[in-house]
UniProtKB/Swiss-Prot annotation:
Source species: Kluyveromyces lactis (strain ATCC 8585 / CBS 2359 / DSM 70799 / NBRC 1267 / NRRL Y-1140 / WM37)
UniProt EC number: 2.3.1.225
Keyword annotations from UniProtKB, A to Z: Acyltransferase, Endoplasmic reticulum, Lipoprotein, Membrane, Palmitate, Transferase, Transmembrane, Transmembrane helix
Function: Palmitoyltransferase that targets several endosomal SNAREs. Palmitoylates the SNAREs at cysteine residues close to the cytoplasmic end of their transmembrane domain. May have a role in the cellular quality control of transmembrane domain-containing proteins.
Name of the featured protein: Palmitoyltransferase SWF1
Broad class of the protein's primary localization: endoplasmic reticulum
TM region(s), chain numbering: 2-22, 50-70, 85-105, 174-194, 204-224
GO BP term, pick one: protein targeting to membrane
Residue numbers on the Lumenal membrane side: 1, 71-84, 195-203
Family (UniProt): Belongs to the DHHC palmitoyltransferase family. SWF1 subfamily.
Gene Ontology terms for molecular function: protein-cysteine S-palmitoyltransferase activity
Recorded catalytic activity of this chain's protein: L-cysteinyl-[protein] + hexadecanoyl-CoA = S-hexadecanoyl-L-cysteinyl-[protein] + CoA
Pfam families per record: DHHC
Entry GO terms, CC: endoplasmic reticulum membrane; Golgi apparatus
Length: 324
């Protein structure tokens, strides 16, 4: 039975990897059209798929709570301090509540969100959302899964099947931090109990230790990444845009005109004048520009992030709707 299961898993991995590349072949065509494309490419089909990861993580947390209270409580409880006995259920409840809030509290609408000024680098005025056909507010982004534009958009999180944006940052960050606290505490506390011989061969104890350790590491890494973005004064969505600008600079193609407006140099030249062609950093502007004596940008210090308020706390306050 195990070999059949292993064969099934390997075959599915192979089909997932190769079906996009060989989708014109009969062997892979059906799988690509009915499995790969609707699951991984088409946002509108099989929308239940977006609940698989949140459901999986909820099951992991529920299973860990089950192991602790139903399988290990009688043996572990005598070694816990009174403060710990109160801390554990409170932290579990807080993690659960912030998780539910992160899933079901949606970001606010564009008009209710903060109205940022364009920086003329990664956000430009009068840009129109190609899906909503409305003016794009700086720092917003259209989410094809949520099917609307999100103010101060960070990313669509697969762990909560919800966009993280202005209006639910406070719940999302609380959920991340509570996971870090609960899982790290559980992992370290169980580690201290390994000295007791009775626990070393207990399969439930080992299972709980491995699960809490693995997911605490995942939670810590992801939380660190999110808080670093806050410290840098950017969102996950903006980081991708800044990376593109930095890439232009590293390749020596980022320039500014006499007014300080940024452009990037194309590899092609004008067919008539043989002069280099420049494009705006505005991805919605496909016009060709001819610049006179443009200055090359040589350092990231020459590029100012208008949205960085200068400190972690100031950047964080800007995202918290409840503090507005």
């Amino acid at each position: 039975m195990f070999l059949l299961f292993l064969l099934f898993v390997v075959s599915q991995v192979g089909l997932l990897v190769f079906s996009p590349k060989f989708k014109d072949l009969i062997l892979f065509r059906w799988y690509y059209q009915h499995i790969y494309y609707p699951l991984f490419t088409d946002y509108t089909r099989y929308r239940w798929k977006y609940w698989l990861v949140p459901g999986f993580y909820a099951c992991i947390l529920i299973f860990c709570v089950h192991l602790f209270y139903n399988k290990l409580n009688d043996t572990v409880n005598p070694y816990l301090y009174s403060l710990e006995k109160a801390f554990i259920p409170i932290t579990i409840a807080f993690t659960s509540l912030t998780g539910v809030a992160s899933v079901f509290v949606k970001p606010l609408g564009l008009q209710a969100g903060p109205q940022f000024q364009p920086d003329y680098i990664i956000f430009h005025p009068s840009a129109v959302c190609q899906t909503c056909k409305t003016i794009k507010v700086p720092r917003s982004k259209h989410c094809p899964i949520c099917e609307r534009c999100i103010p101060l958009h960070d990313h669509h999180c697969i762990w909560i099947n919800n966009c993280v944006g202005y209006g639910n940052y406070e719940y999302f960050y609380s959920f991340l931090l509570s996971n870090c606290l609960l899982l790290t505490y559980a992992s370290l506390r169980l580690l201290t109990l390994f000295r007791i011989t009775a626990f070393k061969k207990d399969k439930f104890f080992l299972s709980l230790f491995l699960l809490t350790t693995a997911f605490s590491l995942i939670a810590i890494v992801f939380t660190y990444y999110q808080l670093k973005l806050v410290n840098d004064g950017m969102t996950n969505n903006e980081q991708d845009k800044w990376y593109l600008v930095q890439e232009y600079m590293r390749n020596g193609n980022l320039v500014k005109d006499m007014d300080g407006v940024l452009y990037y140099r194309s590899m092609s030249t004008d067919a008539q004048t043989a002069e280099p062609i420049f494009y705006s950093t505005n991805l919605y502007d496909h016009s060709k520009y001819h610049l006179i004596n443009p200055a090359k940008i040589l350092s990231h210090e020459e590029i100012i992030n208008l949205y960085d308020r200068g400190s972690f706390l100031d950047n964080l306050k800007e995202r918290i709707h409840l503090l507005d």
